[in-house]
């Protein structure tokens, strides 16, 4: 048995990134390792993103994190009302139908859903 468990990404400021991922995406803190300037954040399905502060400037180098949501348009409306800023609003692109945000370090965060991807 093999299961993809977590993804580790370097960040410039673990506190700032922790706040952004919990407040914006609703991820919850699984655990923190304060002496290593690291935090593990988990989604509702149990997948974790491990954020680790690094001493050098972070280069996202085209990295994108994809989150499946129940309804892209509803999520966009709800999150926009909460003040979340999107880099791209709901639209069809080469990868399907969704929206895009950018985290404090420049990583692209894409939200999509299967239903609207098939319909649009």
Residue ranges and their predicted role:
Residues 4-12, 39-42, 56-120:
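Vicinal oxygen chelate
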Residues 28-63, 109-114:
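Conserved short beta-strand elements that form part of the metal-binding/catalytic scaffold
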Residues 15-28:
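Amphipathic alpha-helical segments
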Residues 26-32, 86-89:
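Short secondary-structure junctions
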Residues 16, 33-38, 94, 117-119:
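Short glycine/proline-centered loop/turn elements that form peptide/ligand docking sites
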């Amino acid at each position: 048995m093999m299961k993809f468990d977590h993804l580790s990404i370097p960040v410039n400021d673990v506190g700032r990134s922790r706040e952004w991922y919990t407040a914006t995406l609703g991820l919850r803190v699984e655990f923190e390792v304060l002496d290593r300037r690291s935090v593990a954040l988990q989604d509702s399905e149990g997948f974790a993103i491990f954020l680790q502060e690094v001493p050098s400037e972070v280069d996202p180098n085209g990295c994108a994190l994809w989150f499946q949501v129940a309804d892209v348009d509803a999520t966009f409306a709800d999150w926009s009302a909460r003040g979340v800023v999107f880099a791209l609003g709901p639209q069809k692109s080469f990868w399907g139908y969704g929206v895009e945000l950018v985290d404090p370090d420049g990583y692209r965060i894409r939200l999509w859903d299967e239903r609207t991807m098939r319909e649009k």
